[in-house]
Amino acid sequence: MPESRARQRLAEEAARIILEEGVRDYGLAKRKAADHLGMSGRREMPANTEVEAAVLERNRLFAGAENRREYLDRLRVAAVVMERLAGLEPRLVGPLVIGILEPQPLINLHGFAETVEEVIFQLGDMGIQCRSGERHYRGGQGARAPFLSFRGPEGLDIELTVFPADGIRQAPPSPIDGRPMRRLGLPAVQELIAEAEADLAPSD
């Protein structure tokens, strides 16, 4: 099989695994794809950007109306949570930003505060119980950042990674291509909602 075709098949299978099995680690998805296709001995794997392109293409081809409605619902919940946490200047990150609906009912946000403790107190004042953890990023500022997970509206899980107040100026590197992660403020999320609503509107 030509090298280019082998890379394409691996990227496509990794994309299927990401979308259907909810695997978030692109490296793991590629290794599983290689095992599924009998290519586990390969040294050359498709780049993460190739896999992401395959994810977007598969989503474009196979996302039905039900999937698009669920995507819209998840964006609406994200907007509600962002409005409630406006003091943290929250930003939406992750697959929803590029139009991808994960199997897990999860919304990823970045928030900004002097300390994570003040965020925990704020959530407590709102009657929200949360669990804490730590997220690791590749190098640079914010290589480690605490995150809080809690249940949001409609039973969706929220993961809020808390950065220092000045961390809003520099996004951490994306695990896909190493560039600064895309972050969307509430106005941009509302634009996505409007686009998703238009996509679902019946045509004349």
Q: Which positions does each model-derived feature cover?
A:
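Catalytic core of pol beta-like nucleotidyltransferases
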Residues: 4-23, 30-103, 114-204
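Mid-length scaffold segments of soluble, non-membrane domains
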Residues: 106, 110-112
